[in-house]
Design a protein with these regions (language model features):
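Short, flexible helix-loop junctions that flank or precede catalytic/ligand sites
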Residues: 1-175
Length: 175
């Protein structure tokens, strides 16, 4: 279930320390901010560091309809660079959108897809938790270890044609 208060968090993390595999949900903007949310709920740093092994953040986005997907000429390399694409990536990428067809009920979308990020709570992350690193500091450490953000995954999905620019903005704009 969802961890809504300190008591529930403490029970879940203590169960994890005794060898139980614990899955739970917590509303946060991204994986690194989960750590600071637990700290803000009053959970001791040592408990978070010792009990957490992996944090997954996710968003659901509508998938471009593969039957009516067309190039999105409104999305030019400048727009893609504003999203964080390199100049080279932006010049090679081709954005798509669904124009609408009977198979997608004229919406341009067919199905949903997950956009994820996975934070491995490694030794450097555990050490950062113990020294009460901020969310940006945790993210920076994780990125150095190969962490891919939801924005990174979203950009790959735009480049592959599965996700359109507007849906990326709708789902990830507050990030």
């Amino acid at each position: 279930g969802e961890m809504r208060d300190k008591e529930t968090v403490d029970i879940g993390l203590k169960a994890a320390l005794t060898g139980h595999l614990v899955f739970s949900t917590l509303h946060t903007n991204d994986a690194p901010s989960t750590i600071t949310r637990l700290q803000n709920m009053g959970t001791p740093d040592y408990l978070i560091s010792a009990a957490c092994q992996l944090v997954v953040a996710q968003r659901l986005a509508r998938r471009n309809c593969s039957d009516c997907k067309i190039p999105d000429d409104d999305v030019n390399p400048k727009v893609l660079q504003d999203l964080g694409f390199s100049a080279e990536q932006a010049s090679r990428a081709k954005a798509f959108k669904g124009k609408g067809c009977p198979k997608c009920n004229d919406t341009g979308y067919k199905g949903r897809q997950g956009i994820y990020e996975i934070l491995v709570v490694s030794k450097p992350i555990k050490e950062a938790i113990l020294r009460q690193a901020t969310t940006p500091e945790l993210r920076e450490i994780a990125v150095k270890e190969g962490f891919q953000t939801m924005q990174d995954m979203g950009k790959r999905m735009i480049a592959s044609g599965d996700l359109n620019f507007r849906e990326y903005e709708r789902v990830l704009s507050s990030e």
